């Protein structure tokens, strides 16, 4: 998402800091701000408001919203179709800013939230791609809960709204995508679990009332959005050509889970077209799927300026009024930008849309604010009204940010047990690389102001004596300065090299062309490793995968870590892992391809499945059969683990009616509807043993290879569970598998099926055949 001026996040951050700096100068170092929340139905100031039904908390949300909408003029309704919603002072309704962000902490990207001397920063967690690498579903929700608490605290002092356009749950199908760092990775199940978990953490109230919201989350960008700016192809004009099979099998599941399992309050439609239609003007996608099939309880919002884009950039309509009408009629409720505010009234006057459709849109918007308590009067007298500055950047929240980074960091190589290092034995540690002393780079994009930074250098220096040489002036590394780096590595007991990317390499509106280490970083790593006296640990800071084949095969580079963008406490977490205060348990949530893959595969090809006729290799671990640098799920530990199958069936019989067509013909699959799918499930019991001495968490993956029908995936993830095991201990892990849901696949027409025949279940090195028969 960009602003209404279609700016990039880098520019936005510059502008935010410029404004903050200017304000500091003018105010003598302090930023003044209001210290109370904005809200409607302030009966203390205006007792007459108590007579309005929409201010009556005893009525249902539906009754209150209907009472409000019937009192509004057309102009007032139109003014509430945009993110900077107008006030209706005659009814005691203040203006409201819908646009706030909370991708991995409360952000000041977006006009709804800002920091001040009252609350100068908020906890900045790792980017979602690293959180997802933890494969810890409870962590996803816990982080969301902390973020929403800090958001409510900021709202109570007038620094934030209640509606947050997060998370980003698009599938990370191509490593070049600049926004892949914002997502939970390439797997539909993982992305679905992340979406539902994070949304629940943000939204759920302590009393468990699903009609109330702590804050309102928003799953974006719907749908098949994962090209920003690649070789001149821009998101504003890109038409994603997607088969129905890929749409329902890969791109849609996270959004479906977000709405159905997470009960999200909002979905954001994207800039791009899907099969020739702008997503924000496609009634099949909005009214048909989100509201019709999935039953969204909330509002649908456009990405910023998306309606303007479909008119001006995509030329989808002849007039702006027609664009406004088509979007609202398709199911859009709120426009990030001013387009609907400028052209909707004209669309009504031209007969392109009726006022009843406007009523439906504002109903969905106001119903969300009702559920948030915006119309319930003074927030200080409501649940969460006691939250304030004391509840932001708490020591517990900052420790959770550190723990999230620790759980996500992935150990990809560890020759001869070179890690963990022994802090007592290391008398000198060389710390090298353009990201070795990174601070802002650790935060990623859609960031806020963190509570504090701990860079990798700072984290390591807190444990052992260090010497530092950047080796490159920046991550672009057009001119590596090798001498100082080689000198300190040659005399140090061990060397840590921190390389990778930052927002100059991969970001919103900036996709990569290649996936190699930028500039001369590879030369820096290789030459330093060649002269290093002790073990060499390579830490890669990035959102997308890198082709580091050279390091994987270089025996002088003894260990490789992927640290994502690890958030404010990233440096401390990296040090914890390197020195064994935390046993690494992260697993890659995406495939790391060789450069040769991206050389021959255009980013614009949305097909997931391979095409032997053209040589197209397919995408993600589910379909790609070629060479990888590292694979989805890769990651090692300082411990070793043993998996034993305790119990699992070898045969599942699907009960069919006597007159079912498949009883008299050779069906390859069955529809996942009907009585035969009800309560059709089985349990798998596994025993996991930690054979090492160190305590460690282990992610247990349950994969399935289905029968080769309907261009099925070669392998897909059915379930995962993260378990903590002390040294030499074991635990029983159980999975309940719903045959029609979990073993199901999508056919060429987008229909859900369960394949008949042999399914091969995988857990670690174990393989177990399961036959699904009639």
From Swiss-Prot:
InterPro entries attached to this UniProt entry: BXL, Fn3-like, Glyco_hydro_3_C, Glyco_hydro_3_C_sf, Glyco_hydro_3_N, Glyco_hydro_3_N_sf, Glycoside_hydrolase_SF, Ig-like_fold
Active site (record annotation): 303
Disulfide-linked positions: none
Broad class of where this protein is predominantly found: secreted
Alphabetical list of Pfam families matching this protein: Fn3-like, Glyco_hydro_3, Glyco_hydro_3_C
Catalytic activity, EC: 3.2.1.37, 3.2.1.55
Gene3D superfamilies per UniProt: Glycoside hydrolase family 3 C-terminal domain (3.40.50.1700), Glycoside hydrolase, family 3, N-terminal domain (3.20.20.300), Immunoglobulins (2.60.40.10)
Glycosylation sites: 136, 437
Keywords: Carbohydrate metabolism, Extracellular matrix, Glycoprotein, Glycosidase, Hydrolase, Multifunctional enzyme, Polysaccharide degradation, Secreted, Signal, Xylan degradation
GO molecular function, one term: alpha-L-arabinofuranosidase activity
Signal peptide: 1-33
Localization terms from the record: Secreted, Extracellular space, Extracellular matrix
Tagged with keyword Hydrolase: yes
Reaction equations catalysed: Hydrolysis of (1->4)-beta-D-xylans, to remove successive D-xylose residues from the non-reducing termini; Hydrolysis of terminal non-reducing alpha-L-arabinofuranoside residues in alpha-L-arabinosides
Superkingdom of origin: Eukaryota
A single GO cellular-component term on record: apoplast
Function: A bifunctional beta-xylosidase/alpha-L-arabinosidase, exo-enzyme that acts synergistically with endohydrolases. Releases xylose and arabinose from cell walls.
Family designation: Belongs to the glycoside hydrolase 3 family.
PANTHER family: BETA-XYLOSIDASE_ALPHA-L-ARABINOFURANOSIDASE-LIKE PROTEIN, SUGAR HYDROLASE-RELATED
UniProt protein name: Beta-xylosidase/alpha-L-arabinofuranosidase 2
Organism, as annotated: Medicago sativa subsp. varia
Organism phylogeny: Eukaryota, Viridiplantae, Streptophyta, Embryophyta, Tracheophyta
């Amino acid at each position: 998402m960009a602003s209404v001026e279609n700016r990039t996040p880098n520019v936005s951050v510059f502008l935010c800091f410029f404004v903050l700096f200017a304000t500091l100068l003018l105010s003598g170092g302090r930023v003044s701000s209001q210290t109370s929340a904005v809200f409607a139905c302030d009966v203390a100031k205006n007792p007459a408001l108590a007579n309005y039904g929409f201010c009556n908390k005893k009525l249902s949300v539906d009754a209150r919203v209907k009472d409000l909408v019937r009192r509004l003029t057309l102009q007032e309704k139109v003014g509430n179709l945009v993110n900077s919603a107008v006030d209706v002072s005659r009814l005691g309704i203040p203006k409201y800013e819908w646009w706030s962000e909370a991708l991995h902490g409360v952000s000041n990207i977006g006009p709804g939230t800002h920091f001040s001397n009252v609350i100068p920063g908020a906890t900045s967690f790792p980017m979602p791609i690293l959180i997802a690498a933890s494969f810890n579903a409870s962590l996803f929700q816990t982080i969301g809960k902390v973020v929403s608490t800090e958001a409510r605290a900021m709202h109570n002092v007038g620094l934030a709204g209640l509606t947050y356009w997060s998370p980003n749950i698009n599938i990370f199908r191509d490593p070049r995508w600049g926004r892949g760092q914002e997502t939970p990775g390439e797997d539909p199940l993982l992305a679905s679990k992340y979406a539902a978990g994070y949304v629940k953490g943000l939204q759920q109230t302590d009393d468990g009332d699903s009609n109330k919201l702590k804050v309102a989350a928003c799953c974006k960008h719907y749908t098949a959005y994962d090209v920003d700016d690649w070789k001149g192809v821009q998101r504003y004009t890109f038409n994603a050509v997607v088969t129905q099979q890929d749409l329902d099998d890969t791109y849609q599941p996270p959004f479906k889970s977000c709405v159905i399992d997470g009960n999200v309050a909002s979905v954001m439609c994207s800039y791009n077209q899907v099969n020739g239609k702008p997503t924000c003007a496609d009634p099949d996608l909005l009214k048909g799927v989100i509201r019709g099939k999935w039953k969204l309880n909330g509002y649908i919002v456009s990405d910023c300026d998306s309606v303007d884009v479909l008119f001006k950039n995509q030329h989808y309509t002849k007039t702006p009024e027609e664009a406004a009408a088509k979007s609202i009629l398709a199911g859009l409720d709120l426009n990030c930008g001013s387009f609907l505010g400028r052209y909707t009234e004209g669309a009504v006057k031209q007969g392109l849309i009726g006022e009843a459709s406007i009523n439906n849109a504002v109903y969905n918007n106001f119903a969300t604010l009702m559920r948030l308590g915006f119309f319930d009067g003074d927030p200080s007298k409501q649940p969460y009204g006691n939250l304030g500055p004391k509840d932001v950047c708490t020591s517990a929240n900052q420790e959770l940010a550190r723990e999230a980074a620790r759980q996500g960091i992935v150990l990809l190589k560890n020759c001869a047990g070179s890690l963990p290092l022994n802090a007592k034995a290391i008398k000198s540690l060389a710390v090298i690389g353009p990201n070795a002393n990174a601070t802002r780079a650790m935060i990623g994009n859609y960031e806020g102001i963190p509570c504090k930074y701990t860079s990798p250098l700072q984290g390591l220096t807190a444990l052992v004596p260090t010497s530092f040489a950047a080796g490159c002036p920046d991550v672009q590394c057009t001119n590596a300065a090798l001498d100082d780096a080689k000198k300190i590595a040659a005399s140090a007991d061990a060397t840590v090299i921190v390389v990778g990317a930052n927002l100059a390499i991969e970001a919103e509106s900036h996709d990569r062309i290649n996936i190699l280490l930028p500039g001369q970083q590879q030369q820096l790593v290789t030459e330093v490793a060649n002269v290093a006296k002790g073990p060499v640990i390579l830490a890669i800071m990035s959102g997308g995968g890198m082709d580091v084949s050279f390091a994987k095969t270089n025996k002088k580079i003894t260990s490789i870590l992927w640290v994502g963008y690890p958030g404010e406490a990233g440096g401390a977490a990296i040090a914890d892992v390197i020195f064994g205060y935390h046993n690494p348990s992260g697993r890659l949530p995406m495939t790391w391809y060789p450069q040769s893959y991206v050389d021959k595969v255009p980013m614009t090809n949305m097909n997931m499945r391979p095409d032997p006729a053209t040589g197209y290799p397919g995408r993600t671990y589910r379909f790609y059969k070629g060479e990888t640098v590292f694979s989805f799920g890769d990651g090692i530990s300082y411990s070793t683990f043993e998996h034993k199958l305790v119990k699992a069936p070898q045969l599942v019989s699907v009960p069919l009616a006597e007159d079912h067509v498949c009883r008299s013909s050779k069906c390859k699959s069955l529809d996942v509807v009907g009585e035969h799918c009800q309560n059709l499930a089985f349990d798998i019991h596994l025993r996991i043993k930690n054979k090492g001495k160190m305590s460690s968490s282990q992610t247990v993956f349950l994969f399935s290879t289905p029968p080769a029908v309907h261009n099925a995936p070669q392998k897909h993830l059915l379930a995962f569970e993260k378990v903590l095991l002390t040294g030499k201990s074991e635990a029983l892990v159980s999975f309940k598998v719903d045959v029609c849901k979990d073993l199901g696949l999508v056919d060429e027409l987008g229909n859900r099926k369960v394949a008949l025949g042999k399914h091969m279940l995988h857990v670690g090195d174990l393989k177990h055949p399961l036959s699904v028969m009639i």
